[in-house]
Amino acid sequence: MGMFSNLKRTSDIEESKDTLGGFILESDIYTTNIVTAYSDFFKSGAQYINVKFLVTKPDGSTQNFNERFTITNKQGSIFYVGKDGKKHALPGYEIMDDMCLLTTGKTLAEQETEKKVLMIWNSNEGKEVPTEVDCLVDLFGKDILLAIQKIRRNKQVADASGKYIDSKEEQFLNQSRKVFDAEYKATVPEIRTAERNNVAPEATFINKWLAKNKGVTLDEYKEIISGTSAGFSGSTGNANGASAQTRIFGRRAS
């Protein structure tokens, strides 16, 4: 049984919908290779997956991009209850589940892990050190298209009590917003629709995302009058006459 088998999406958690919503990358959709992916826990007890990507930029050069995707809260739940009163998967879980489906044909809950030693940053030593971690090995080396957003926020600093709060200083960072299939350029919802209708996926959301977000910096910076304020919290017919069925996720599981 895999370490994510208890994190299955139940029927009362809403399916995702396509909504627009090192060096800093400009907002764009990038051809991306998954170098490594491993799971660990924050001190709070929340579980995350750290993914190292190799991003190909428009000029053909490549850049490493690391991101942590929080897949549970500290109670081990994969969902939150939205303003609509419905359960929604955590954004980090949603992206990782889509990433797993698009690259392996299996959900995050179906992924197996292997212990491997990776070079991981150790804050106490101030450098990367060999560390044994639980790796999602089936993701290693797989390609995806990743919608990356450039964001402007307040830089957070520790106050006297050690709590992190917003400062006046601005910072720019990148966050993954959506995952697209490298072959079809389609999202998981688009592929699900195609499979239900036994047709090839129609990739339309990718152009909508680009039209709204390409080159746009999402400004979440808050003006601070004096001192610091409370921290910002926030961080996709066969031969025998039977009808053929388009199974994109299924064939990637083999």
Explain the meaning of each model-derived region.
Residues 1-254:
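Short beta-rich binding modules
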